[in-house]
C-alpha cells in the first residue's frame, strides 16, 4: 500500500508539473495560433499552407505541436500567414508566408521553420500585420518590412521591402499595432501615431486619405495600449477608457449607426479597461479586475457567449475574474487564465482552436497542455488521434515504423510491438498521460497522449 501511495503521489506531482502554469504567451493569425509555454518552448497549431506552423511541413495541425527544441523564446506575433518571434538573447526570427517579404530575410521564399533575421540582438517588441511586419529595438527605434501597397511601412513610398527598414529617426517608440494595410504606434510620451491605408478612417486623423509617413492622431498624450486589425484600430487611455476608430459596419465596435469612424470614438463609459485585442469583426478586452469581455460579430462563436449572435455593448464572458492574457485570430478568441490554462472559442476550420477537432466552439474550450507534440526531432508525416482518447489511438501516415513502445510518466513500458500498426488499443490503460515512442530508421520520435 505504501508503495502504491508513493507511486500515486509521484504521478500526481508529474501530472501537475505538466499542467501547472503551462501557457505563457499567445498570438493568433488568420487560421493559426502560436504560443510560448512557461518553459520557453514554442508551439503552434491550425492552418499551415504556407508553413506558418513552423514544423517543416504544410500540413494543418489541430493540436499544439512543438517547434524545434529551443526553450529560450520570450515574445511572439502572428500575422495572417506568417510569424515573428524574439529569443531571450534579443535575436529576431520569422517563418511562414513570405510573398511580400514580410519575413525580412531578404527573399520572398516561404520558410517552413523559424529563421533568424539579420544579426542584431537588441529586438524588444514585435507585431505582425496581415502581410507586413513591425519591430522596435531596445533603442526605441521602429523598423518595418513586407507589403507596402498603401504605405503601411511608413517610409514615404509604396515599395515592398524584404528586409527591415527604419521608420524615421525617432527613438522613443514604445508599442505597435498592425492591420491589413495600416500601422499604429505609441511613443513613450503617450502620443498616438498611424500611417498606411485610411479608406475607413483607420488612421483616426479625421479623413480617409492614406498616409505614407507616421502622422499624429489628435493631440492627446495619455494613450496607454493599442491594437489594430483589418481596417480598424482600438486603444485604451491611461484613465482606463476604451476607444475605437475605422471600419464599424455593422456597428461591431461602436453602436452609433455609423459605418466609418474617422476619429477615436469612446466605447461606453467604463473606465476600468486593462488590455484590448481585436479580430476581424470582434474584440475582446480585460478589465482591471481580470474579468473577460467581448463584443462584435459572433457568427462563429468567437464571443464565447454560447451563441452565434452579435453582441453590443461589451458583455462579460462567464463570471470568472482570473484572466491574464488575451488575443484574437480573425474569427476566433484565445485567453489564458492566471493558472496558465489556455481557453479558445470561435472558428475552427483549420484546427486553430487546438482542441484536436475542426468544429467551431461557441463557449471557451480548454487546450490541453500535454498535447500531441513531437518533443524531439519532428516527423512531419505522422499524426496521432484522437488525443485525448478513451479506447484507441490511430497512427496515420506512419511510414516505415519499425517499433512502437508506450510508456507511462514513470517510464514503465505498458505496450510494445514490432508490428506495423495503424491503431493501438489502449482501453485497458489507466487514466493518465502516456508517451508513444515510434522508431523509424533507427530514430525515436516521442508523442504525448492522454488516456481519459
Indicate where each model-derived feature is located:
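Hydrophobic loop/turn residues within beta-sheet-rich immunoglobulin-like superfamily modules
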Residues: 36, 86, 120, 136, ...
